[in-house]
Amino acid sequence: KKLGKKGLTPSKIGIILRDSHGVAQVRFVNGNKILRIMKSVGLKPDIPEDLYHMIKKAVAIRKHLERNRKDKDGKFRLILVESRIHRLARYYKTKSVLPPNWKYESSTASALVA
């Protein structure tokens, strides 16, 4: 709870508990996963962590491409990352983690990760 209130992600909380407190798996100790505990307290993140990091990566590549317009490999990697974002979003919509009207747009992506 305390670490979640500081604004840490579930994976960061797991790393801190593993390294500082010797808790190998929170699930074995508590019976619940970190994200479930955060949900019950009301600290669930808006978008899932893996999707958040994908969007963050796409924003970084897009920023790089603004400075380096001829980077063809960068453009290709951006296409791959964005298609992965769309695939993950579709999965999370079917699992009702994301609302059905949620949509990834490159213009608003930097606001999502800021």
UniProtKB/Swiss-Prot annotation:
Pfam families cross-referenced by the UniProt entry: Ribosomal_S13_N, Ribosomal_S15
**Family matches, as SMART domains:** Ribosomal_S15
Keywords, sorted A to Z: Ribonucleoprotein, Ribosomal protein
What GO CC annotations are associated with the protein?
A: cytosolic small ribosomal subunit; nucleolus
| Cited InterPro entries | Ribosomal_uS15, Ribosomal_uS15_arc_euk, Ribosomal_uS15_N, uS15_NS1_RNA-bd_sf
A molecular function (GO) term? small ribosomal subunit rRNA binding
The alphabetized list of GO BP terms reads: translation
Give the protein family. Belongs to the universal ribosomal protein uS15 family.
Task: Spell out the protein name for this chain.
Answer: Small ribosomal subunit protein uS15
**Taxonomic lineage of this organism?**
Eukaryota, Metazoa, Ecdysozoa, Arthropoda, Hexapoda
**What is the primary gene name for this protein?**
RpS13
